[in-house]
Amino acid sequence: MKRTTLLLLAVAALFCVSCNNRPKYSEELQQTAPALCKGAEKKLVCMDLDATLTQHKTPLSDSARQALDKLGERYALLMVGGGGAERIHKQMLDYPIDVLGNYGMEEARVVDGEWKIVRKEVCPVDTASVLAKCQALREKYGYTEYYGKSVEIHASGMLTFGLLGTEAPKEEKLAFDPDKAKRRAMYKEVCEDFSDYSVFIGGSTSFDMTPKQYNKYDAIMRFAEENGYSRDEIIFIGDDLDDGGNDSHVRLGGMDYIRVYDYRDFPKLVEPLLQ
Protein backbone atom coordinates (compact mmCIF):
# COMPACT_ATOMS: atom_id res chain seq x y z
CA MET A 1 0.00 0.00 0.00
CA LYS A 2 1.16 3.55 -0.66
CA ARG A 3 2.33 5.58 2.31
CA THR A 4 -0.48 8.11 1.81
CA THR A 5 -3.08 5.31 1.99
CA LEU A 6 -1.53 3.97 5.17
CA LEU A 7 -1.56 7.50 6.57
CA LEU A 8 -5.27 7.87 5.85
CA LEU A 9 -6.05 4.56 7.57
CA ALA A 10 -3.95 5.56 10.56
CA VAL A 11 -5.71 8.90 10.87
CA ALA A 12 -9.10 7.21 10.72
CA ALA A 13 -8.13 4.68 13.37
CA LEU A 14 -6.72 7.36 15.64
CA PHE A 15 -9.79 9.55 15.43
CA CYS A 16 -12.04 6.57 16.18
CA VAL A 17 -10.20 5.40 19.29
CA SER A 18 -8.91 8.60 20.88
CA CYS A 19 -11.83 10.98 20.79
CA ASN A 20 -14.49 9.56 23.08
CA ASN A 21 -14.30 12.70 25.18
CA ARG A 22 -13.84 15.11 22.27
CA PRO A 23 -16.36 14.28 19.53
CA LYS A 24 -15.39 17.33 17.48
CA TYR A 25 -12.35 15.42 16.24
CA SER A 26 -14.46 12.81 14.45
CA GLU A 27 -16.31 15.62 12.66
CA GLU A 28 -13.01 17.17 11.61
CA LEU A 29 -11.79 13.84 10.20
CA GLN A 30 -13.77 14.33 6.99
CA GLN A 31 -11.71 17.42 6.24
CA THR A 32 -8.36 16.54 7.78
CA ALA A 33 -7.74 12.96 6.67
CA PRO A 34 -8.23 13.54 2.92
CA ALA A 35 -6.11 16.67 3.18
CA LEU A 36 -3.23 14.64 4.58
CA CYS A 37 -3.34 12.33 1.60
CA LYS A 38 -3.56 14.67 -1.36
CA GLY A 39 -0.71 16.04 -3.40
CA ALA A 40 2.96 15.52 -2.64
CA GLU A 41 4.30 13.64 0.34
CA LYS A 42 4.78 15.89 3.34
CA LYS A 43 8.27 17.14 4.10
CA LEU A 44 7.73 20.20 6.33
CA VAL A 45 5.59 20.21 9.49
CA CYS A 46 4.68 23.72 10.66
CA MET A 47 2.90 24.36 13.92
CA ASP A 48 1.51 26.95 16.27
CA LEU A 49 2.60 27.00 19.92
CA ASP A 50 -0.03 28.30 22.38
CA ALA A 51 -3.08 26.01 22.64
CA THR A 52 -1.48 23.67 20.09
CA LEU A 53 1.66 22.41 21.83
CA THR A 54 1.22 24.13 25.19
CA GLN A 55 -1.28 26.01 27.27
CA HIS A 56 -1.03 29.74 26.70
CA LYS A 57 2.48 30.96 27.61
CA THR A 58 3.37 27.82 29.57
CA PRO A 59 6.56 25.77 29.11
CA LEU A 60 6.80 22.87 26.70
CA SER A 61 5.81 19.59 28.36
CA ASP A 62 7.87 16.41 28.23
CA SER A 63 5.20 14.65 26.16
CA ALA A 64 5.12 17.46 23.59
CA ARG A 65 8.92 17.50 23.43
CA GLN A 66 9.01 13.76 22.80
CA ALA A 67 6.42 14.15 20.02
CA LEU A 68 8.58 16.85 18.41
CA ASP A 69 11.64 14.63 18.66
CA LYS A 70 9.82 11.87 16.77
CA LEU A 71 8.51 14.25 14.13
CA GLY A 72 11.97 15.73 13.70
CA GLU A 73 13.38 12.34 12.76
CA ARG A 74 11.15 12.27 9.66
CA TYR A 75 10.29 15.89 8.79
CA ALA A 76 11.72 19.38 8.84
CA LEU A 77 9.99 21.30 11.65
CA LEU A 78 8.99 24.96 11.79
CA MET A 79 7.34 26.84 14.64
CA VAL A 80 5.11 29.67 13.42
CA GLY A 81 3.92 32.00 16.17
CA GLY A 82 2.28 35.30 16.85
CA GLY A 83 4.79 36.12 19.59
CA GLY A 84 8.42 37.10 19.21
CA ALA A 85 10.92 34.40 18.25
CA GLU A 86 12.92 34.78 21.47
CA ARG A 87 9.79 34.45 23.62
CA ILE A 88 8.78 31.32 21.70
CA HIS A 89 12.28 29.84 22.07
CA LYS A 90 12.26 30.51 25.81
CA GLN A 91 8.76 29.04 26.24
CA MET A 92 9.93 25.92 24.38
CA LEU A 93 12.80 25.62 26.87
CA ASP A 94 15.40 26.25 24.16
CA TYR A 95 14.16 23.41 21.96
CA PRO A 96 16.23 23.42 18.72
CA ILE A 97 13.64 24.35 16.10
CA ASP A 98 13.43 26.97 13.37
CA VAL A 99 10.98 29.74 14.32
CA LEU A 100 8.97 32.35 12.47
CA GLY A 101 7.92 34.90 15.09
CA ASN A 102 5.55 37.85 15.00
CA TYR A 103 3.62 36.31 12.08
CA GLY A 104 6.75 36.23 9.96
CA MET A 105 8.34 39.53 10.93
CA GLU A 106 11.12 37.55 12.63
CA GLU A 107 12.97 34.41 11.59
CA ALA A 108 15.28 32.28 13.73
CA ARG A 109 17.23 29.25 12.50
CA VAL A 110 19.26 26.46 14.02
CA VAL A 111 22.67 26.86 12.37
CA ASP A 112 25.46 24.41 13.27
CA GLY A 113 23.57 23.51 16.42
CA GLU A 114 23.15 27.14 17.49
CA TRP A 115 19.73 28.83 17.56
CA LYS A 116 19.91 32.44 16.40
CA ILE A 117 17.70 35.14 14.91
CA VAL A 118 18.61 35.71 11.28
CA ARG A 119 15.96 38.24 10.26
CA LYS A 120 14.01 41.01 12.02
CA GLU A 121 11.70 43.35 10.17
CA VAL A 122 10.38 46.59 11.65
CA CYS A 123 7.47 48.80 10.60
CA PRO A 124 6.70 52.34 11.88
CA VAL A 125 3.71 52.97 14.14
CA ASP A 126 1.54 56.07 14.56
CA THR A 127 1.41 55.74 18.34
CA ALA A 128 -1.07 58.55 19.00
CA SER A 129 -3.54 57.16 16.48
CA VAL A 130 -3.24 53.62 17.86
CA LEU A 131 -3.84 54.74 21.45
CA ALA A 132 -6.84 56.86 20.46
CA LYS A 133 -8.47 54.04 18.50
CA CYS A 134 -7.95 51.52 21.29
CA GLN A 135 -9.38 53.92 23.87
CA ALA A 136 -12.47 54.53 21.71
CA LEU A 137 -13.02 50.78 21.43
CA ARG A 138 -12.64 50.36 25.18
CA GLU A 139 -15.22 53.05 25.87
CA LYS A 140 -17.70 51.61 23.38
CA TYR A 141 -17.43 48.00 24.61
CA GLY A 142 -16.91 48.61 28.32
CA TYR A 143 -13.25 47.70 28.82
CA THR A 144 -12.09 50.96 30.37
CA GLU A 145 -10.55 49.27 33.41
CA TYR A 146 -7.43 47.23 32.76
CA TYR A 147 -4.05 46.22 34.16
CA GLY A 148 -0.90 47.97 32.97
CA LYS A 149 -0.99 49.55 29.53
CA SER A 150 -3.96 49.60 27.18
CA VAL A 151 -1.99 48.32 24.19
CA GLU A 152 1.49 46.91 23.73
CA ILE A 153 3.38 48.46 20.82
CA HIS A 154 6.20 46.09 19.97
CA ALA A 155 9.55 47.22 18.62
CA SER A 156 8.69 45.38 15.40
CA GLY A 157 5.63 47.55 14.81
CA MET A 158 3.23 44.78 15.77
CA LEU A 159 0.43 45.64 18.21
CA THR A 160 -1.15 43.59 21.00
CA PHE A 161 -4.45 45.06 22.16
CA GLY A 162 -5.28 43.12 25.33
CA LEU A 163 -8.75 43.89 26.66
CA LEU A 164 -7.57 43.25 30.24
CA GLY A 165 -4.36 45.23 29.70
CA THR A 166 -0.72 44.25 29.44
CA GLU A 167 -0.28 43.11 33.06
CA ALA A 168 -3.46 41.14 33.81
CA PRO A 169 -3.06 38.09 36.11
CA LYS A 170 -2.72 34.83 34.20
CA GLU A 171 -5.70 33.17 35.90
CA GLU A 172 -7.96 36.10 35.07
CA LYS A 173 -6.79 36.10 31.46
CA LEU A 174 -7.46 32.40 30.98
CA ALA A 175 -10.98 32.73 32.40
CA PHE A 176 -11.87 35.91 30.51
CA ASP A 177 -12.85 34.76 27.01
CA PRO A 178 -12.18 31.03 26.51
CA ASP A 179 -14.62 30.72 23.58
CA LYS A 180 -13.50 34.06 22.08
CA ALA A 181 -17.12 35.28 21.98
CA LYS A 182 -16.31 38.63 23.61
CA ARG A 183 -13.64 39.40 21.05
CA ARG A 184 -15.63 38.09 18.11
CA ALA A 185 -18.40 40.55 19.03
CA MET A 186 -16.08 43.47 18.32
CA TYR A 187 -13.76 41.87 15.76
CA LYS A 188 -15.33 43.47 12.69
CA GLU A 189 -15.04 46.96 14.15
CA VAL A 190 -11.44 46.41 15.24
CA CYS A 191 -10.63 45.36 11.66
CA GLU A 192 -12.33 48.48 10.30
CA ASP A 193 -10.53 50.80 12.72
CA PHE A 194 -7.16 49.17 11.99
CA SER A 195 -7.57 48.70 8.24
CA ASP A 196 -3.82 48.98 7.63
CA TYR A 197 -3.26 45.88 9.76
CA SER A 198 -4.04 42.19 9.67
CA VAL A 199 -6.09 41.67 12.83
CA PHE A 200 -6.23 38.34 14.67
CA ILE A 201 -8.02 37.14 17.77
CA GLY A 202 -4.86 36.09 19.58
CA GLY A 203 -3.89 34.77 22.98
CA SER A 204 -6.54 34.65 25.70
CA THR A 205 -7.68 38.29 25.92
CA SER A 206 -6.16 40.14 23.00
CA PHE A 207 -6.18 41.17 19.39
CA ASP A 208 -2.87 40.79 17.58
CA MET A 209 -2.29 43.30 14.80
CA THR A 210 0.47 43.09 12.25
CA PRO A 211 1.25 45.31 9.27
CA LYS A 212 -1.04 44.10 6.49
CA GLN A 213 1.52 41.97 4.65
CA TYR A 214 2.26 39.66 7.60
CA ASN A 215 0.29 36.51 8.47
CA LYS A 216 1.13 32.87 9.10
CA TYR A 217 0.28 31.60 5.63
CA ASP A 218 2.46 34.12 3.81
CA ALA A 219 5.21 33.64 6.39
CA ILE A 220 5.24 29.88 5.80
CA MET A 221 5.16 30.26 2.02
CA ARG A 222 8.06 32.71 2.10
CA PHE A 223 10.06 30.21 4.17
CA ALA A 224 9.03 27.39 1.81
CA GLU A 225 10.11 29.26 -1.31
CA GLU A 226 13.46 30.12 0.25
CA ASN A 227 14.06 26.50 1.32
CA GLY A 228 12.70 24.52 -1.61
CA TYR A 229 9.31 23.27 -0.38
CA SER A 230 6.07 23.32 -2.35
CA ARG A 231 2.76 24.03 -0.62
CA ASP A 232 1.66 20.40 -1.10
CA GLU A 233 4.73 19.25 0.85
CA ILE A 234 3.66 21.25 3.92
CA ILE A 235 1.21 20.47 6.70
CA PHE A 236 0.27 22.92 9.46
CA ILE A 237 -0.89 22.00 12.97
CA GLY A 238 -2.85 24.64 14.87
CA ASP A 239 -5.88 25.45 16.97
CA ASP A 240 -7.12 28.85 15.85
CA LEU A 241 -8.19 28.24 12.26
CA ASP A 242 -11.66 29.82 12.28
CA ASP A 243 -12.22 33.24 10.72
CA GLY A 244 -10.40 35.86 12.77
CA GLY A 245 -8.15 33.29 14.39
CA ASN A 246 -4.42 33.77 14.15
CA ASP A 247 -4.09 30.53 12.17
CA SER A 248 -6.99 31.37 9.84
CA HIS A 249 -4.87 32.51 6.88
CA VAL A 250 -3.45 28.98 6.68
CA ARG A 251 -6.93 27.53 6.15
CA LEU A 252 -8.01 30.33 3.82
CA GLY A 253 -4.83 29.92 1.78
CA GLY A 254 -5.62 26.27 1.09
CA MET A 255 -2.72 24.72 3.00
CA ASP A 256 -3.26 21.25 4.48
CA TYR A 257 -3.72 21.29 8.25
CA ILE A 258 -4.58 19.34 11.39
CA ARG A 259 -6.79 21.17 13.86
CA VAL A 260 -6.08 20.88 17.60
CA TYR A 261 -8.90 21.38 20.10
CA ASP A 262 -6.85 20.57 23.21
CA TYR A 263 -3.08 20.99 23.39
CA ARG A 264 -2.82 17.84 25.52
CA ASP A 265 -3.87 15.81 22.47
CA PHE A 266 -0.92 16.94 20.34
CA PRO A 267 1.17 13.75 20.78
CA LYS A 268 -1.75 11.56 19.69
CA LEU A 269 -2.78 13.81 16.82
CA VAL A 270 0.64 13.58 15.19
CA GLU A 271 0.88 9.79 15.44
CA PRO A 272 -0.50 9.34 11.89
CA LEU A 273 2.38 11.40 10.55
CA LEU A 274 4.76 8.87 12.08
CA GLN A 275 3.22 5.76 10.47
Model-found features: residue ranges?
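Mg2+-dependent phosphoryl-transfer enzymes with acidic/Ser/Thr/Gly-rich catalytic loops
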Residues: L36, A40, L60, K212, ...
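Active-site phosphate-binding/coordination module
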Residues: T58-G148
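Asp-based phosphoryl-transfer active-site loop
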Residues: E41-T58, M79, I220, D247
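Non-catalytic pre-domain segments flanking phosphatase-related domains
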Residues: T4-M47, S63-Q66, K70
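Residues at the C-termini of beta-strands that transition into short coil/loop
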Residues: Y103, V111, G203, Y261-R264
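Conserved acidic, metal-coordinating active-site core of Asp-based
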Residues: E145-I235, D243-N246
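Hydrophobic "anchor" residues on beta-strands that sit immediately upstream
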Residues: L44-C46, D98, I235
